[in-house]
Regions:
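N-terminal secretory/membrane-targeting segments
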Residues: 1-93, 117-136, 169-177, 304, ...
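Solvent-exposed soluble domains appended to multi-pass membrane proteins
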Residues: 78-87, 100-101, 106-471
């Protein structure tokens, strides 16, 4: 009997309400699923192994059913109708680029960092975007990694903070569905471009589930042009990324969606660049070893190259006579500083730079220059769909109406940066907001959001059967 119990234990270890679940918690098992290293220290290796062997994606909402999803469809159809009265554009006719800039953070926002004033500002152009685009801080669910999770959030509008467990949706969620809804489905043509290997995070398989028309990567049937590496770095530069972005823009006459993923500033940061003017000019309390200062100087030089490449790219799209909107975002902090410092600077070390820029032609045809600062200083990656649709003055579907209401009415929703279960709410000043302070309307929005996310991560995808909900 004992042997049978031990055999069956992993199968129900994390399932609420069962006998094994209660035995598990009788051992004072403190599950967080956010920080595996800390979990081992708190729970020991055996309990931690059992915690992770049978992950629950989300708790099932009490009233989850086809009728519950249909109710939300009807509810947000009405919201979409109201929103669309003030919108005139069809996003399908736009060219929209979601540009994941690998590990991009404004170097001046690192905690305690000091860059010698004699050194040039490495990100002067990107900082200048504050005055002519929607611009602010993006809250990342990762530190030094988690690229695919940020990409999943941008494409789906769903949120890592809603998960019960630490997981990678591209690997552990998306493959469970034959089709997976993304912003790309709202366009007649969608593609992804990545001047690196395409197999990481099951991207090739998942983009098929997204019904992307094309994925250009190193070794694919679609050639990556103008491959250029900087200094001793083994990664293709951001110039390569944007040259291929321009190529894709010019290949289509009408609107399209492009998921543009860079690689230049990926770790490690091993003094790649000759004539690096930031070497010896970086200091700060957290930059207390020669090795860390050298890595930071290398990273800063990389951001300078990014800044120049972005400036060139925006100059190019401004000359193109079709509406183009660029959503630029850093996916996470680089792994220069020890992750242990995130406990001291939880929000700061999970905040990257983002901006949303609509080219001259788009602005001449109804797109906004920038959105109100109040709701955009701190955002989550999952907010980008709603923000892009607002900036391009595009009509929304019922699902996008839900995302729009969440962005407008709620603080930014993100993972709990302290490593605890559940999501965290961050206001426009970068400060946590307690759930109990939310209004009834705000709490209802979160409940609706959780229901839809459960449906497309652990549920039966009833929303796909509701005509027009996603598209």
């Amino acid at each position: 009997l004992l042997s049978l119990l031990l055999f069956l234990t992993p199968m129900r270890f994390n399932h609420d309400g069962g006998m094994i679940y209660h035995i598990n918690h009788g051992f004072d098992n403190k599950q967080s699923f956010r920080n595996p290293e800390r979990d081992i220290q708190v729970n020991g290796p055996v309990l931690n192994f059992l915690n992770y062997i049978d992950l629950q994606v989300m708790n099932k909402p009490a009233n989850y059913s086809p009728s519950a999803i249909n109710h939300l469809d009807e509810k947000y159809k009405k919201v979409a109708t109201d929103i669309n009265k003030g919108r005139k554009n069809n996003v399908k006719k736009q060219t929209v680029i979601f540009n994941l800039s690998e590990s991009f953070v404004d170097p001046y926002t690192f905690p305690t960092v000091k860059i010698d004033k004699s050194a040039p500002n490495p990100v002067k152009f990107i900082q200048s975007m504050k005055g002519r685009s929607t611009y602010g801080n993006m809250l990342s669910a990762g530190y030094g990694g988690g690229t695919a999770n940020m990409e999943w959030e941008t494409l789906t509008g769903l949120n890592m903070g809603m998960f019960k467990s630490t997981l990678t949706p591209y690997v552990q969620v998306v493959p469970n569905y034959s089709f997976y809804p993304t912003i790309g489905m709202n366009f007649g043509y969608s593609s992804a471009v990545h001047p690196f290997i395409g197999t990481y995070y099951s991207r090739i398989e998942d983009y098929h589930r997204f019904k992307f028309n094309k994925f250009a990567y190193l070794g694919s049937k679609y050639k990556i042009i103008d491959q250029k590496k900087l200094g001793k770095s083994s990664y293709n530069s951001d110039y390569t990324t944007y040259d291929n972005g321009i190529k894709q823009i010019n290949e289509r006459k009408g609107g399209q969606f492009i998921n543009l993923i860079s690689i230049q500033n990926h770790m490690p940061y091993n003094n790649w660049y000759p004539r690096n003017e930031y070497m010896g000019r970086v200091s700060g309390d957290l930059f207390n070893t020669a090795a860390v200062r050298s890595q930071m100087a290398t990273y800063i030089k990389g951001t300078q190259y990014t800044d120049k490449a972005v400036k060139k790219f925006i100059g190019q799209i401004d000359k193109i006579h079709k509406p183009i909107t660029l959503v630029f975002y850093g996916d996470h902090y680089p792994s220069v500083l020890s992750q242990s410092f995130t406990a001291q600077y939880p929000v700061q070390m999970h905040s990257t730079r983002y901006f949303i820029y609509s080219n001259r032609y788009a602005r001449e045809h109804g797109a906004k220059t920038k959105l109100p600062t109040r709701t955009n200083n701190y955002v989550n990656t999952s907010d980008f769909i709603a923000m892009m649709l607002q900036q391009t003055n595009s009509k929304v579907t019922p699902y996008q109406a839900l995302l729009t209401e969440i962005h407008k009415e709620l603080p930014a929703i993100t993972i709990n940066f302290n490593g605890d279960k559940g999501y965290e709410l961050i206001n426009e000043h970068g400060h946590p907001v307690e759930y109990k302070t939310l209004t009834k309307k705000q709490k209802a929005l979160i409940n609706d959001y959780e229901m839809i996310q459960y449906d497309m991560t652990a549920g039966k995808a009833y929303g796909l059967k509701a005509k027009g909900f996603y598209k």
